[in-house]
Amino acid sequence: MRKLLLLVMLTGFGIATFAQKSYQFRIDTKEMKALDRTLTSVEPLSAVPLTKSDKQAKRITPPADRDVNIVSIISIGTSANAYGYYGNQRSYVWVESPINAVSNFHRMGGALDPGGYSGDYGYDISTDGGQNFTNEIEVYKATNNAGGTYYLDAARYPNHAIYNPDGNTDPANAYIVFFGPNLDGSNGGSWGGYSYGVASIGDTSYHTKNLLSSHDDFYHLIPSAYDLTSQGLSMVVDINYDIANSTYLDQLNLIRGYWDDNVKDFVYTEELMDAEMPGSGSTADEKVAFSPDGQTGYICVLGDNDMAEQPGGFKGYYPIYWKSTDAGQTWDGPYFIQLDGPNGIGGIVYHHLTDEQIENLFEPPIPAREDINYTTAFDFDIAVDNNGNMHIAVVIGPTGGNEYSIITTKNYIAAVDIFTNDGGTTWFAEEMGRIENFRGNFGDISCDNRIQITASQDYSKFFISWLDTDIEDAEENNQPNIFIRGFDPTTYMKTQGDASGTDGPTNVTLFSEGMWQAYFFAAPKVCFESDKGTYNIPFVYEDMDPNDPIQPVQFKYIQDFTFTDADFVIQAIKKHETDARTNATVSQNFPNPFNGTTYFTLSLEKGNNVSLVISTLTGQQVSTKDYGYLTSGLHNLSISSNNLPAGVYFYTVNIGNQKVTRKMIVE
């Protein structure tokens, strides 16, 4: 057993000077550690009234000459507050293609459930591929308040799926399956119980309710690992954690459920599996996934079990996994994935940081690439392809000076797919996109990039999505867009970022009502594929007040974001520029006219010093801003109308010796 001090966020600025460390960071290094994994059990009953955030973006209509495809977004269910989507669960949204259904599972309350309780569960469902929804169907109701303010069976962060009997094509014969923690207090504090059951889609009056408290050697926490296989296994993984003594018990709790037709419900059993973490003291996150035939499965955690080499004397997280080839009955492992060092993944060791980034990050003497320590971030997602190979969607970056922290300086972290093509003997890393901002803070809750992975129907292609605030001045991930990139591991082709062929991820919510406010998004494990080679990836996010998460939220469903096979292209090999030319493009600002804040994009072929000058029509300078050195790639920059009277202005972007001028109008 290991005594575990629950991790809290740490943002540090300083030189890392620790014993037995082989290199030092420059003084402006920014790093973070994992959030408290116990999450919030009892939310505030009321909150101080707050004004809706001034940063809350309204729907932006792009100019007619702009080649963009704004997604269609509709309102579906509601919830009493924003906490329900707050955890690391990755099964809030489920697609069941044989019945053309997609469901969103959440806690109740909000505008569609007046007076509803956040300890109850419900769902929203479409059986026509996401075009029309029936919302706020309640399936679980807390009833045991034991004389207190909060009900002991109040349900929290849910996992869910659609159980569709083999060969069925009628949604009425399918069931919603759910499994989550509750507040029965059997594991110390508020936590300790599980709430689970099923609900008939065809007969909404039929739903089951089952409760299981911590017992014997089983200490229940908040399971974030869930999958429902094609063979009908409902698989949950939790850590065995004694809250009263703040002790991780070096075990995972494997919870298997099978459909019992006699009781029209899933019946579960529990089993403990050894999972010692002597380095990190516990895991940061856990996931489980199976191949499309349900035969090959992986349980994967982020942790440090002292098996991996940690170069440079720094401590970080890495993937540790167990594998099953008999439909989840037995598990082999643990195995670990070496990210860094001489035996690490080449795509990380030799390609994650550029020479320029290494020079800017470390004090002399500059370490060799093989001596730089890398870590995963603190949440992730996994999928298993049609050949039984695991894909790990995770954010990686250099390990910080503090143990189990990650450098979060802009563009030093990236969303990647770590995958194998031979069952786990060899591992590769393919970058999906650079990340500008890591963590968002919303009142008393926070979330990181929430990276997720969605498979095509045949599990041959994968779509990795995450949240990022792509505004140059932003220091936190508080105004997130949804980014996504598709990857074909057989051909190594990836999707283009936009119609111009940008080598990077696609901004799903660009110019939509979700732009810069796609809070706590969720993606399904599998996408729709109505036409062969057309991949419709549904997303759900919370429309919420970012300053006050206790306020009711509206769930928003993105209906029509798609990739096609034609979007997958061979990525060009980047050339090393040796001349002095500066190739940069500056967009027209949007919105325009504006009052408040407007934005423009700057595309740099290579890094350079950038500044901004705003002047009147007569040439009088009224404002200047120096952005310093910006790296190559896309940058979203902002202009404020504060202290600018209504009128017409020019903004000039200076990129090295190049100048680009555009006209803007302040209302």
Regions picked out by a protein language model, each given a short descriptive name:
Residues 1-7, 11, 15-18, 577-667:
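C-terminal outer-membrane/trafficking sorting elements
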Residues 20-571:
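Extracellular, repeat-based ectodomains that mediate carbohydrate processing or recognition
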